[in-house]
């Protein structure tokens, strides 16, 4: 019995970079804000933002608390982050408009 593979969120790295940029933090600053500090280097945050590595659930929960959005906003590619971060209260994200695709005949 192995682990079932799952599709990784495609926009997660983009959202994590947006959070850090909006908060005006360096990668080291983000590490400190996440409470990871000296245990990890800048490359750890860079790996998340470049989609080279997926953050663990506890790290995603910390991102969620820092910017006051529900965790599903981070991992659901159909949801966008709110314009203002951190949100004034927990935010459920902004649903992207669905694009109707033309069907092939």
Regions found by a protein language model. Give the residues of each.
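Short, charged recognition helix plus adjacent turn
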Residues: 1-2, 6, 65, 72-105
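Flexible interhelical turns and helix-capping residues at alpha-helix boundaries
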Residues: 5, 20-23, 38, 52-53
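Residue-level signal for the short linker/turn that defines the boundary of a DNA-recognition helix
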Residues: 11-14, 24-25, 40, 55-58
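Short basic helix-loop element that most often maps to the first helix and adjoining turn
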Residues: 14-35, 62
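Recognition helix of helix-turn-helix/homeodomain-like DNA-binding domains
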Residues: 35-55
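DNA major-groove recognition helix of helix-turn-helix/homeodomain DNA-binding modules
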Residues: 52, 56-73
């Amino acid at each position: 019995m192995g682990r079932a593979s799952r599709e990784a969120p495609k926009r997660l790295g983009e959202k994590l970079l947006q959070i850090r940029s909006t908060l005006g933090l360096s990668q080291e600053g983000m590490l400190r804000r996440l409470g990871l500090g000296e245990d990890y280097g800048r490359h750890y945050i860079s790996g998340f933002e470049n989609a080279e590595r997926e953050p663990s659930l506890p790290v995603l929960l910390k991102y969620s608390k820092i910017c006051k959005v529900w965790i599903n906003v981070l991992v659901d590619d159909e949801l966008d982050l709110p314009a203002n971060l951190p949100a004034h209260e927990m935010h459920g994200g902004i649903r992207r408009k669905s694009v109707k695709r033309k069907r092939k005949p």
